[in-house]
Amino acid sequence: MKKNQSAAIGKVSLDDKYALAATRAYMTGIEALVRLPMLQHQRDQSRGLNTAAYISGYRGSPIGGLDQALWKARPWLDKHNVVFQPGINEDLAATAVWGSQQTNLFEGARYDGVFGMWYGKGPGVDRSMDVIKHANAFGTSRYG
């Protein structure tokens, strides 16, 4: 590598994928899914909102390694009010995510809203349609 090429690249760390705020970071697709709720939290903060995230899904999902990547990124997720709790199955995970988005139903909520992320496999999506249908009909809190 030429001298000027290394200067252009700069110092690179494996933590960049979660630690960098305003520059390019290289990551896998799974790592991008892990970073997504952190970015949403940053966007909400810039709008003056105090939000959190709740992530759940079925560990047997074909999104291999997402649960492990979320656990590994916990120090960064904690800084952005992101909670990961795997579900026993897709139905329970989807129900938990929807429930986390109902902050407007209770007085004294700690957050302006909780946005959610759910994942599952094909047959689990079919089974979870009841929850998804009710969540779409009932909705979420304003910032959920």
Put a short name on every predicted segment.
Residues 1-144:
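Thiamine diphosphate
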